[in-house]
């Protein structure tokens, strides 16, 4: 049924459709409404066979099958919140032990059992991680950090020199009471490695010890693991090779920051585990992740033809759209399917928060190009300390704006769905994350792509490595002090990209007095390059 047809229904028919398509679970205080999406009741029967295969595939994954074929790895982030479902006692025991270690470490930091060199409590954490190793912890912080409780978190998630300088200098007043966390599965990823080296130099330049306040989250036996052990870092937590960065938030990557800000990590894990249980049901209509993935599939005709706009009506979920960008787009954005057919799949994700966005891009959503669906996220419970003033309750207005925007979009024929939680806490965030993780897994089965590899990301890393190698070759060539044109440099290095050489030298000449580019930049082919 088209969304325009839905809006034309009379009230009784709309209410009947709403009730037929509404999913709810009392134990989680959770509702999912897809009645304003392009989903028909008979879709449950029509999609039964393909979902039966998808459910079996997800069950096989949880049982330990090799899901990441490219790397020959299992995919086990679901085990992190319920070690009992892990495929071996060894894995189960290691997960349980790691949760206990993180809880104990967090408590020891917060209660002052572990202190800095002066016997004072730690006050801050400088977190170095890229992608999911940074976005997950940031989501945890934004969701649960409260003033005067726990440590203050600062994030370094890029190699922007200006950003590195600003963020390191911002912690200088509390440097003596700052912990440093470095997250890297392999220990060789350039961004966290460079961030670690800069942070380490900053600490040592200020005559302080690095290893006594440094913490690693990495795979056992990795370069970072070896370094942390050799230098006797404060602690090391495990990032198993069967956990991908974009699904690492229920492991040490998310649990450690949660523990350090005083959040309840067991409640967080239980919420995710409860949602996992709900989404193991092999019946589309009674499985919220299946309903969500079906709505995505029908909306974009199984080809990602519509973007996903994420609109949480809660400030603490403002970064959730960024978190979902990686989870959804890195998992589903694939050139080839599992049978090597070129499919160019994916769903684009963007968003911010309501009601702020009603004064921004919602104008286009209502009246512009119809190439999206909106995912509203609603929280019912409001904090008691915000009371009615002059006959106005902020929560009533927030809810009114959500309902009004929903209605306006539906009236305009724009598809939308709503996820509602009774309250927002560690449990509901865990459940929300698990819901999307499992919807992504099911959707990937529908379109026959591998949700657990990232060949495009790897291609970008390889290309960046080639550029760094080319820069070193350019620097070595110019060490003789001779003047050369860009074409002469290109020929000398047998390069296939004069443009790359130009871009490298333009950057070098701006940041070093040793390199000069003589001539008119509007005619780069005439420039004379030299090094003094």
UniProtKB/Swiss-Prot annotation:
Subcellular location: Cytoplasm
GO biological process: gluconeogenesis; glucose 6-phosphate metabolic process; glycolytic process
Catalytic activity: alpha-D-glucose 6-phosphate = beta-D-fructose 6-phosphate
Catalytic residues of the enzyme: 330 (proton donor), 359, 461
Gene Ontology molecular function: any one: monosaccharide binding
Pathway where this protein functions: Carbohydrate biosynthesis; gluconeogenesis; Carbohydrate degradation; glycolysis; D-glyceraldehyde 3-phosphate and glycerone phosphate from D-glucose: step 2/4
Entry protein name: Glucose-6-phosphate isomerase
The EC number(s) this enzyme carries: 5.3.1.9
Species of the source: Prochlorococcus marinus (strain NATL1A)
């Amino acid at each position: 049924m088209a969304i325009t047809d839905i809006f034309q229904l009379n009230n009784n028919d709309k209410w009947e459709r709403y009730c037929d398509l509404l999913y709810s679970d009392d134990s989680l205080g959770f509702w999912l409404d897809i009645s304003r999406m392009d989903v028909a009741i008979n879709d449950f029967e029509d999609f039964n066979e393909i979902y039966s295969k998808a459910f079996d595939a997800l069950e096989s994954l949880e049982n330990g099958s090799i899901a990441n074929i490219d790397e020959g790895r299992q995919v086990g982030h679901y085990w992190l919140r319920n070690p009992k479902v892990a495929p071996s006692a060894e894995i189960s025991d290691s997960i349980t032990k790691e949760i206990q270690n993180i809880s104990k470490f967090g408590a020891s930091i917060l209660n002052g059992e572990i202190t800095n060199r002066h016997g004072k409590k730690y006050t801050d954490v400088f977190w170095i991680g890229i992608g999911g190793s940074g976005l997950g912890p940031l989501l945890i912080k934004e969701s649960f950090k409260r003033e005067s409780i726990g440590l203050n978190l600062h994030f370094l998630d890029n190699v922007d020199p200006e950003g590195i300088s600003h963020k390191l200098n911002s912690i200088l007043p509390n440097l003596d009471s700052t912990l440093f966390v470095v997250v890297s599965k392999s220990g060789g990823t350039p961004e966290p490695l460079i961030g670690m080296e800069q942070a380490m130099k900053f600490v040592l330049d200020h005559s302080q010890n690095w290893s006594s306040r440094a913490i690693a989250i990495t795979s056992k036996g990795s370069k970072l693991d070896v370094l942390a052990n050799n230098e006797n870092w404060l602690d090391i937590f495990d990032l198993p090779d069967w956990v991908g960065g974009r699904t690492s938030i229920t492991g040490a990557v998310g649990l450690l920051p949660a523990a350090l800000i005083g959040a309840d990590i067991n409640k967080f894990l239980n919420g995710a585990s409860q949602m996992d249980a709900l989404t193991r049901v092999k019946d589309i209509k009674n499985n919220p992740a299946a309903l969500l993935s079906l709505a995505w599939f029908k909306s974009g005709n199984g080809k990602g033809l519509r973007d996903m706009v994420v609109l949480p009506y809660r400030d603490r979920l403002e970064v959730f759209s960024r978190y979902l960008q990686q989870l959804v787009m890195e998992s589903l954005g694939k050139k080839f399917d599992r049978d090597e057919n070129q499919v160019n799949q994916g769903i684009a994700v963007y968003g911010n928060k309501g009601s702020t966005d009603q004064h921004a891009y919602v104008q286009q959503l209502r009246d512009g190009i119809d190439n999206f669906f909106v995912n509203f996220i609603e929280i019912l419970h409001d904090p008691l300390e915000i009371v009615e003033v002059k006959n106005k309750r902020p929560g009533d207005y927030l809810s009114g704006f959500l309902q009004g925007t929903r209605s306006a979009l539906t009236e305009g024929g724009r598809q939308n769905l709503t996820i509602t939680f009774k309250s927002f806490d560690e449990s509901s965030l865990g459940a929300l994350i698990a819901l999307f993780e499992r919807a992504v897994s099911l959707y990937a089965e529908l379109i026959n792509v591998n949700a657990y590899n990232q060949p495009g990301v790897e291609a970008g890393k390889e290309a960046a490595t080639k550029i760094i190698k080319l820069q070193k070759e350019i620097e070595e060539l110019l060490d003789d002090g001779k003047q050369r044109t860009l074409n002469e440099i290109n020929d000398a290095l047998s390069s296939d990209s004069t443009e790359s050489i130009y871009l490298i030298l333009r950057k070098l000449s701006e940041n070093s007095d040793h390199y000069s580019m003589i001539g008119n930049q509007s005619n780069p082919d005439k420039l004379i390059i030299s090094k003094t």
